[in-house]
A protein has these predicted regions:
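Active-site nucleophile/metal-coordination loop of metallo-enzymes that catalyze phosphate/sulfate
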Residues: 19-32, 40-208, 218, 305
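Ser/Thr/Pro/Gly-rich low-complexity, intrinsically disordered segments
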Residues: 2-3
Length: 305
C-alpha cells in the first residue's frame, strides 16, 4: 500500500510540475507533506519490514532529493528520556511546528510538585468518601508504555490514598499492545514491591475489552458488568490467574474481564471512581457507562456514580 501511495505521490508531483510549466511558464515552489505512520529508520535488518522490503519509489526520493532525519522519541518531542514516541506525539509536534511538552512528563512533574496534596477537589472527595466509609476505585491501564497512561502515576495516587487511610480498589487494565504481549507479571511485581501485596486488585481486564473506542459496546459491557456486578471469571491470586491465561496462549491485551473473589462491587452510595488514563479516547466509553445519566448503549441497573 505504501509503495502504491508513494508511486502516485511521485506522479502527482510530476503532473503538477508539467501543468504549472504549461500554464504560467514558471515553476512555483510546492510542498507535499506525506506522513508514513510507523516508517522508521534503522540499520538493523532483522525483523525490520522497512529495511527488508523493496522500496524503489522511496529510494528514488532519498537519492534524488535533499533529506534529513527527525528524532521522534524522548525530549525532542516533549517526552521523558528514552520514552518511545507514538502517532499522537508525532502528529502533535508536526502540527505545532515546535516541541510540545506532552501529558506524560507534565503529569509526572505535577506529582513531584505536591500536586495531590494541593488538589482541593480530590481531597474534598477523599474526606467525603472516608465519612461514608467508602472506597476509591482506580481504573486505568497499568503499563509503562506511556501512550495512554503510566503505571508510576497510578502508584503515586495509590500511595497518597493509602496515606489518607482510604480503602483502594484497583481495576487493573492490562496492556500488551504498547508493551510486550506478556508484561503484566512485571507490573504486578512492582505493585507487590511497593505495597507488600496484591490484595487491593479488584479486577483484571485486557485493554481489548476495557478500552474499546469504536463503539463495540459488547466489549465495554463485559468490563462494566465485571467491575459493577462482579460478573466474569473469579480469581484468588492475580499472579496465578495471569500465568493461567498465558498457559492458554492469551496475552495481556485479550484477557477477559475477571474479578477477585474478595471484591464486592461498586457501592454507588459510598464509593468514588478515578480514571487514570491521561489520553481520553479509550476511556470515554467506560466512563460514560459509569457516569452518564443519559447512557443507553447497553442496559445498566444502577444510577451513575
Amino acid at each position: 500500500i505504501v509503495q502504491h501511495q508513494l508511486y502516485w505521490v511521485i506522479h502527482i508531483i510530476k503532473i503538477e510540475y508539467m501543468c504549472e510549466q504549461k500554464m504560467n511558464g514558471k515553476i512555483k515552489n510546492q510542498t507535499i507533506l506525506c506522513i508514513l505512520d510507523g516508517w522508521g529508520i534503522s540499520k538493523v535488518t532483522k525483523g525490520n519490514a522497512v529495511k527488508l522490503a523493496k522500496t524503489p519509489n522511496f529510494d528514488y526520493l532519498l537519492y534524488n532529493f535533499p533529506n534529513a532525519n527527525l528524532i521522534t522519541y524522548g525530549p525532542s518531542v516533549g517526552l521523558p528520556k528514552n520514552q518511545v514516541g507514538n502517532s499522537e506525539v508525532g502528529h502533535m509536534n508536526l502540527g505545532a511546528g515546535r516541541k510540545v511538552q506532552m501529558d506524560l512528563p507534565r503529569i509526572s512533574q505535577a506529582f513531584s510538585n505536591n500536586f495531590l496534596a494541593e488538589n482541593k477537589i480530590l481531597n474534598s472527595s477523599i474526606a467525603n468518601i472516608n465519612k461514608r466509609n467508602g472506597a476509591i476505585h482506580i481504573i486505568g491501564l497499568c503499563s509503562d508504555g506511556g501512550v495512554h497512561s503510566h503505571e508510576d502515576h497510578i502508584f503515586e495516587l495509590i500511595k497518597y490514598l493509602k496515606k489518607n487511610n482510604l480503602r483502594v480498589l484497583l481495576h487493573m487494565i492490562l496492556d500488551g499492545r504498547d508493551t510486550s504481549p506478556k508484561n503484566s507479571l512485571n507490573n504486578m511485581k512492582k505493585i507487590k514491591f511497593l505495597f507488600g501485596d496484591l490484595d487491593f486488585i479488584a479486577s483484571i481486564s485486557g485493554r481489548y475489552f476495557a478500552m474499546d473506542r469504536d463503539q463495540r459496546w459488547d466489549r465495554t459491557e463485559k468490563f462494566y458488568r465485571t467491575i459493577v456486578y462482579r460478573e466474569g471469571e473469579k480469581f484468588d491470586d492475580p499472579e496465578t490467574f495471569i500465568k493461567k491465561q498465558y498457559s492458554k496462549e492469551i496475552n495481556d491485551e485479550f484477557v477477559k474481564p475477571s474479578v477477585s473473589i474478595n471484591y464486592s462491587g461498586i457501592d454507588y452510595k459510598r464509593d468514588g471512581v478515578i480514571f487514570m488514563n491521561f489520553r481520553s479516547d479509550r476511556m470515554r466509553q467506560i466512563s460514560h457507562a459509569l457516569c452518564d445519566e443519559n447512557f443507553n448503549n447497553f442496559f445498566t441497573y444502577s444510577k451513575p456514580i
